[in-house]
From Swiss-Prot:
It is found in: Cytoplasm. AMP binds at residues 31, 36, 57-59, 85-88, 92, 156, 167. Pathway: Purine metabolism; AMP biosynthesis via salvage pathway; AMP from ADP: step 1/1. Consists of three domains, a large central CORE domain and two small peripheral domains, NMPbind and LID, which undergo movements during catalysis. The LID domain closes over the site of phosphoryl transfer upon ATP binding. Assembling and dissambling the active center during each catalytic cycle provides an effective means to prevent ATP hydrolysis. Its main location: cytoplasm. Belongs to the adenylate kinase family. Signal peptide: none annotated. Keywords: ATP-binding, Cytoplasm, Kinase, Nucleotide biosynthesis, Nucleotide-binding, Transferase. Residues 30-59 are annotated as: NMP. This is Adenylate kinase. ATP binds at residues 10-15, 123, 132-133, 200.
Amino acid sequence: MRIILLGAPGAGKGTQAQFIMDKYGIPQISTGDMLRAAIKAGTELGKQAKSVIDAGQLVSDEIILGLVKERIAQEDCAKGFLLDGFPRTIPQADGLKENGVSIDYVLEFDVADEVIVERMSGRRAHLPSGRTYHVVYNPPKEEGKDDETGEPLVIREDDKPETVLARLGIYHEQTAPLIAYYNKEAEAGNTKYLKFDGTKLVAEVSAEIEKALA
């Protein structure tokens, strides 16, 4: 089962990725993790990536695709894998196809921007411990204070509405073409495209995924 996940930051993708990994026993492949592992292991591709990163440049699609191919050839991917954060562009999606990497399912988690802004901007964090709260969904016992220490909670830079909106803008710009691409692929019978309502309860979405992948 080879799966690609699409969804804006804050759409609940990470939670469902964990559910799929546990349920089907397949690993999640993140390009960031792969890059770090290849650099640490000093593989040929790792060395190439390191020299590019050290020069302050972006790692090419060619190197990333090489890493993906190496990674999915490993034993733990025998039953399949979950790609998150890749492909991000049409050339990357084409690259996967040209390298003979077939995808069984593309799962999109759809949540309106205003809902994501509300979700993210309601987050509060206690930085020293890493504990997180939400003013609506998981409020602290006392407003604005950490449950255990009573220290003040903060809004992380990443959760501020303007930051969230900027990230969403980039996401839509990058991902809208991919959504169209994989819908076309599904029409051609090359993959199955499934769209889920990310505003539903986590357990509901998980149940829908399980049913769709059965």
